[in-house]
């Protein structure tokens, strides 16, 4: 703390004294030995600047004193470490006045105003702290390393004593008993406790050195927040007064008199009862402080002593316990001594120095404030995230009440609305698909992600029938008006029928008068040039312009029909709908011409049966539309199932009552009901059968939309020559009626199309091979059956193994139980005999059991065959608990008296060989024959459960004698009878019996767990070991801890309805 007496020797230029080399060398050597690290080519200040060596020195003296060392190569990191070092020194017992300032180690080479003298003084402050730390380490019990040689510091101490003598004023008196004694006594007397004393209200506002390092006064905090700077207790503020040499010098503080302090409390600037009017707001305080600084700078400059302030507002209290060594403000530069105190040049020089110091300090404070604001913002972000996480946990666990909890849980209406929205999006994407692969990918992706109402459909692979359904059913693509669009998806995901084929069509023109062609129809009468157009051209995913209106809900004769089930009149009802949708517009392309739905303009449908072809006539009625009754009259089918997938043709029964019919011929090959419902046998020998023998396949119930529609239900013909009439709206607009020709390969020569006009032009177009398609469908179905069979077999084997394992464990449990009972009976001293009274008691209890077991009797009589088989398989059953059954079915009365009552001892009466858990029975599909599984709470488990079909043999071990059983019944208390009920249950996780240990039972869901098996199904964490209870959620049959449940909720995994 070298400080020359500027006030006494103002005319002599000061030369910086060389630092005491022995003290530097000893301090450096001691630090290197203790820490094991070398300074290298760095000097003393540079080696200690980052504070890492100092912190490691403290940890070597007392391990764990500095928890975290900041090793970043920044000045702020060094300041952090230095502050941690000074804090650790306090914990070792060093006092405030023995510590250097954190800024004493900063690099001041680039500062203009800091001279060599100030640099030397700061290093001496560091050496003094090392000296006291060495003394503390020598007395520390946990330190056993190298001791600091205190003799090397004698030169430093003597030099500081000399400086103290020079700087001291004549008014002060110090004892001459030695520097160290004076130092220690003064420190222990007036310097050691940080008393937070202040001068008068003007001086002490900014005398930051008088404050405690850890508890800055309120005005600093207020000013730090109002300036935008952090309130920092390690470095000074820019509004600080110019230093007082006598007051601020470290050695002067150590030797100053302990004058009486004013009894001003620490929080004197906070409003309280005693000084409510003395509180000065922070902005006013700052202005006063600034005015006071200028006043003090002038008074200090003109003072004869350089440090004594002549103007005081109140009684002066010297602040001798200043916690700082105030790095940049303590010393005036040596040039000040050469200037006369009263000259104007000296005043200007002082003002210049003051401004430079302010600028440097402002820059330092700005850097520090930026760094602190960065750290503060990062901390606030962390705190905010933590609060959000806790709030989310409270919300999910329901601690904030049900109202907030309900906000995070969707209602059923919201779930349904979201499901409908997903389905609409799926329909749009599916409708806009450009290729078959893309459409199948969209559908498969939806099925994998969401359930389609039936859980079975989730696992079904999509059959490749989309191409056929779109090439022959273009009306199914009109999703938006469909009231229940999911029906189409269900239909698409069902296995396709075995036999399918398409319709090959050609159209030939014939000369018919134009007036007749357009008579009696409601379609637009614009004339179109006749074209020959291919019908049913396979454009799988295109859609006509107006086909959106085709698919609507329809009702025929009071029956509402759904897509999957074709009721009578459905096809006619569909044909009545939307004629404008199927009618092509004025500018029709070839593909649009026949992609509409073939609809009927309220005209009757009749079929004319030929030997190898069917003739469909078109009649355009001039009268009002008639009500169709052909499809609504249902005839009795003979109940046969058409194994070949062929349908006999149905016939209509209505004669048209007006206009001359215009004929066109159709020949239809064999078709699948899912492709078109106009289905006729392609075998010539079947063509001649009676039309009433229309067979209805089961697959027809699953068939979807239709294209060329005839009724599925057939009606008996009322006329000898039935005739079908269809009105095609796209024929109405043509001047000449086109011939619709559907060639049959086997009967092409017999087709009546040869009788038509020679101008008919047949068209060749693409058609898939029905035989190849049939083979593919059969192969697919066989593969599915094989996979199902394998899966079923695996499940059966697994169930069999689990059942046998459970049987063995139950038998082992019962065997041990009876061994214990036998030992207890053998150890009993009281002799037991079977008396007549005991026999009577047994028979009475048996009759009570019979009365309570009537339901068991009824159940067992329902399946006597199985009981006979079971008795033949298990010859040892008389030792088990089915003696009741033997009694009912004519067992010997002697066995009654020796067989224990099932109600008396449920553990004994439960049959060993035939017991099975109800869950296992349900999985194995064992027929129960009306037997109800016994609930877990029912103590008398005397119900006889039949064997599952997978069991081969039971290994039933013989039990103890009936005498011992009888004795056991008489001794047993009702409390003992219930103790092993859970032992018969199987763990839902590992499949083993629960036994007698701790178990977790959720009876409402039929879930049973060993306490060690009660784990989260996702993270496998233990759920049953919490002291304060466990929050368990069961999601899709799987145990979920709170963390995994919240994670799955935030990931958005859907819960099935």
Curated annotation (Swiss-Prot):
The modification Phosphothreonine is found at residues 215, 402, 472, 529, 537, 725, 899. CDD domains: CH_LIMCH1 (cd21278), LIM (cd08368). Residues 185-326, 373-412, 468-493, 514-769, 795-817, 833-910, 923-957 are annotated as: Disordered. Keywords: Coiled coil, Cytoplasm, Cytoskeleton, LIM domain, Metal-binding, Phosphoprotein, Zinc. It is found in: Cytoplasm, Cytoskeleton, Stress fiber. Residues 229-260, 382-412, 694-704, 856-872 have a biased composition (Basic and acidic residues). PROSITE patterns: CH (PS50021), LIM_DOMAIN_1 (PS00478), LIM_DOMAIN_2 (PS50023). The modification Phosphoserine is found at residues 169, 177, 192, 201, 204, 207, 217, 226, 231, 233, 297, 303, 377, 471, 518, 523, 603, 672, 719, 751, 757, 760, 973. The modification Phosphotyrosine is found at residue 313. Residues 269-278, 472-481, 514-534, 606-615, 663-672, 736-760, 896-908, 931-953 have a biased composition (Polar residues). Interacts with MYH9; independently of the integration of MYH9 into the myosin complex. This is LIM and calponin homology domains-containing protein 1. The lineage of its organism: Eukaryota, Metazoa, Chordata, Craniata, Vertebrata.
């Amino acid at each position: 703390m070298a400080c020359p007496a500027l006030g006494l020797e103002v005319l002599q230029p000061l030369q910086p004294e060389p630092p005491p080399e022995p003290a530097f060398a000893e301090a450096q050597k001691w630090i290197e030995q203790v820490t094991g690290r070398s300074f290298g080519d760095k000097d003393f200040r540079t080696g200690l600047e980052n504070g890492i060596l100092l912190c490691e020195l403290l940890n070597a003296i007392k391990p764990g004193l500095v928890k975290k060392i900041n090793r970043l190569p920044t000045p702020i990191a060094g300041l952090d470490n230095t502050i941690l070092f000074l804090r650790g020194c306090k914990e070792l017992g060093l006092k405030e006045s023995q510590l250097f300032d954190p800024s004493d180690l900063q690099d001041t080479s680039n500062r203009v105003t800091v001279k060599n003298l100030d640099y030397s003084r700061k290093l001496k402050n560091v050496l003094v702290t090392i000296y006291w730390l060495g003394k503390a380490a020598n007395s520390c019990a946990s330190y056993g390393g190298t001791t600091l040689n205190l003799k090397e510091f004698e030169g430093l101490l003597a030099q500081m004593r000399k400086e103290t003598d020079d700087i001291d004023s004549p008014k002060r008196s110090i004892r001459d008993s030695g520097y160290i004694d004076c130092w220690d006594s003064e420190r222990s007397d007036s310097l050691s406790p940080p008393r937070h004393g202040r001068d008068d209200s003007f001086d002490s506002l900014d005398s930051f050195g008088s404050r405690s390092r850890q508890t800055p006064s309120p005005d600093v905090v207020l000013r730090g927040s109002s300036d935008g700077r952090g309130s920092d207790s390690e470095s000074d503020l820019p509004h600080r007064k110019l230093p007082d040499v006598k007051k601020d010098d470290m050695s002067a503080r150590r030797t100053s008199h302990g004058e009486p302090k004013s009894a001003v409390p620490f929080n004197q600037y906070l409003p309280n009862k005693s000084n409510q009017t003395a509180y000065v707001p922070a902005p006013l305080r700052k202005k006063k402080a600034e005015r006071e600084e200028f006043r003090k700078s002038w008074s200090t400059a003109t003072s004869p002593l350089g440090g004594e302030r002549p103007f005081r507002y109140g009684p002066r209290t010297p602040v001798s316990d200043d916690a700082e060594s105030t790095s940049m403000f303590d010393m005036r530069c040596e040039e000040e001594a050469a200037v006369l105190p009263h000259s104007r040049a000296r005043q200007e020089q002082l003002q210049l120095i003051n401004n430079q110091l302010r600028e440097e300090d402002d820059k330092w404070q700005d850097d520090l404030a930026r760094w602190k604001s960065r750290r503060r913002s990062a901390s606030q972000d962390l705190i905010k995230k933590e609060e959000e996480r806790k709030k989310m946990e409270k919300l999910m666990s329901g601690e904030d009440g049900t109202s907030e909890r309900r906000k995070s849980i969707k209602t059923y209406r919201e779930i349904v609305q979201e499901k409908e929205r997903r389905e609409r999006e799926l329909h749009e994407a599916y409708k806009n698909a450009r290729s078959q692969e893309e459409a199948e990918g969209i559908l498969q992706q939806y099925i994998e992600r969401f359930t389609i109402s039936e859980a079975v459909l989730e696992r079904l692979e999509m059959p490749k029938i989309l191409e056929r359904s779109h090439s022959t059913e273009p009306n199914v693509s009109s999703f938006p008006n469909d009231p229940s669009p999911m029906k189409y998806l269900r239909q698409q995901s069902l296995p396709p029928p075995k036999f399918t084929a398409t319709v090959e069509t050609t159209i030939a023109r014939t000369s018919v008068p134009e007036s007749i062609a357009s008579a009696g129809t409601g379609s637009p009468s614009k004339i179109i040039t006749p074209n020959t157009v291919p019908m049913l051209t396979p454009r799988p995913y295109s859609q006509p312009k107006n086909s959106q209106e085709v698919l609507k809900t329809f009702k025929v004769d009071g029956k509402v029909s759904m897509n999957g089930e074709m009721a009578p009149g459905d096809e006619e009802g569909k044909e009545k709908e939307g004629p404008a949708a199927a009618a092509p517009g004025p500018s029709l392309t070839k593909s649009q011409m026949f992609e509409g739905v073939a609809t009927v303009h309220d005209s009757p449908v009749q079929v004319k049966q030929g030997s190898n072809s069917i003739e469909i006539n078109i009649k355009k009625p001039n009268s009002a539309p008639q009500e169709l009754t052909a499809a609504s009259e249902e005839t009795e089918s003979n109940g046969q199932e058409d194994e070949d997938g062929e349908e006999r043709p149905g016939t209509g029964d209505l004669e048209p009552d007006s206009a001359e019919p215009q004929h066109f011929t159709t020949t239809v090959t064999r078709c699948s009901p899912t492709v078109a419902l106009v289905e006729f046998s392609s075998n010539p020998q079947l063509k001649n059968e009676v039309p009433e023998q229309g067979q209805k396949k089961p697959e027809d119930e699953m068939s979807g939309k239709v294209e060329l529609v005839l009724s599925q239900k057939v009606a008996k013909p009322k006329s000898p020559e039935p005739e079908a009439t269809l009105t095609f709206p796209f024929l109405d607009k043509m001047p000449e009626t086109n011939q619709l020709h559907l060639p049959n390969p086997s009967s092409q020569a017999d087709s009546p199309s040869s009788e038509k006009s020679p101008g008919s032009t047949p068209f060749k177009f693409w058609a898939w091979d029905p035989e190849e398609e049939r083979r593919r469908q059969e192969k697919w179905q066989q593969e599915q059956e094989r996979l199902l069979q394998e899966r079923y077999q695996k499940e059966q084997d697994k169930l069999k193994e689990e059942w046998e394992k459970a049987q063995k464990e139950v038998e082992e449990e019962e065997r041990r139980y009876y061994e214990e009972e036998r030992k207890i009976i053998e150890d009993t001293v009281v002799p037991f005999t079977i008396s007549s009274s005991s026999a009577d008691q047994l028979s009475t209890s048996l009759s009570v059991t019979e009365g309570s077991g009537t339901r068991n009797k009824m159940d067992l009589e329902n399946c006597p065959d199985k009981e006979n088989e079971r008795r033949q398989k298990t010859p040892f059953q008389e030792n088990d608990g089915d003696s009741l059954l033997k009694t009912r079915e004519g067992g010997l009365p002697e066995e009654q008296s020796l067989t224990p009552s099932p109600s008396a001892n449920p553990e004994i009466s439960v049959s060993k060989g035939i017991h099975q858990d109800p869950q296992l029975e349900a999985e194995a599909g064992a027929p129960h024959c009306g037997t109800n599984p016994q609930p877990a709470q029912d103590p008398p488990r005397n119900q006889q459960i039949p064997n599952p079909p997978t069991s081969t043999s039971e290994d039933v071990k013989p039990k103890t004698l009936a005498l011992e059983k009888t004795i056991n019944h008489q001794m047993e208390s009702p409390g003992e009878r219930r103790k092993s009920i859970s032992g018969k249950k199987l763990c839902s996780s590992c499949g083993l019996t629960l036994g007698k240990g701790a178990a977790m039972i959720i009876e409402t869901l039929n879930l049973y767990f060993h306490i060690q098996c009660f784990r989260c199904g996702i993270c496998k964490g233990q759920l049953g070991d919490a002291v304060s209870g466990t929050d368990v959620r069961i999601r899709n049959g799987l145990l979920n801890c709170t963390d995994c449940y919240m994670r799955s909720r935030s990931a958005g995994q859907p819960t099935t309805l």
